[in-house]
Amino acid sequence: MPAMSEWKKARNIAIVLSAGRGSRMHTQTPKQYLDLCGRPVIAWSLGAFEAFDGVDDVILVSSPEDIEYCRSEIVEAYGLSKVRRVIPGGAERYLSVWEGLKEAKRIRDQGQEGPADGGYLFVHDGARPLVDSAILERTLADAGKYSACVAAMPVKDTIKVSDEEGFAAQTPDRRLLWQIQTPQVFSFSLVYEAYRKLIEEGITQVTDDAMVVERETEVRVKLTEGSWKNLKITTPEDLEIARLFLRQENNYSAGR
């Protein structure tokens, strides 16, 4: 496994996704821009990468209509100097990631330091504001070992598979089931080529980046310990839980 100093020689880039609208929040404001203890949700997510030495550049992928807001009210307002680009996303998550990957390749091709084939790519949901340095360190370490990993937690509840009529059809072994989070971290060349093939094939049924790597390569994706605090803001209840966690930590003035 490479030492942290070796990871820093390569250029590591994070794509932070902020193009979703979040209809389940029942608000006009997209969930990633809602206030969370004095700052927008997305500002917390970006702040975690800003403070993490293992990432050099951040690409923020936004809805086209929100780009100027993100630049002025998020990136500039909170001094997020690692955010090199704010770009428009696609109609689906995987298309937004592909736009981010193409932009990341342009950054790498502009003569930046680091080996041409080296470096790692983080993909993170902007609506996961409580990601912390420990998760980022663990996922980067496992990406160095295995070339592909995702933050994840073992499920707590029994999971049922339903039939088409809504009846329980199967009960998988809970010991084998994990709830997937972000970041998802990959060797840059691996994930770029996997996405390129996926787009070329016209595949559209994709729910996360690990699924693309699983489908298009023979590399196994490592499940890396995330955190139950690393929740995704999807419903009003999630926002209240995130506020509770931040208040307990008493660190929201520091911006992490």
Predicted regions and their residues:
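Conserved alpha/beta core of the MobA/IspD/sugar-nucleotide pyrophosphorylase nucleotidyltransferase superfamily
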Residues: 5-7, 177-256
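N-terminal glycine-rich phosphate-binding loop and ensuing alpha1 helix
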Residues: 6-70
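A structural signal for isolated positions on well-ordered beta-strands in alpha/beta enzyme cores
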Residues: 13, 56-59, 85, 122, ...
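Hydrophobic packing residues within well-ordered alpha-helices of enzyme cores
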Residues: 25, 49, 70-74, 139, ...
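Short aromatic/basic micro-patch
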Residues: 35, 130, 171, 185, ...
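Short helix-capping segments at alpha-helix termini
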Residues: 52-54, 76-82
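Conserved donor nucleotide-binding strand/loop of the catalytic core
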Residues: 79-91
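Conserved beta-loop-beta/alpha segment of the NTase-like Rossmann-fold superfamily
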Residues: 91-164, 181, 186
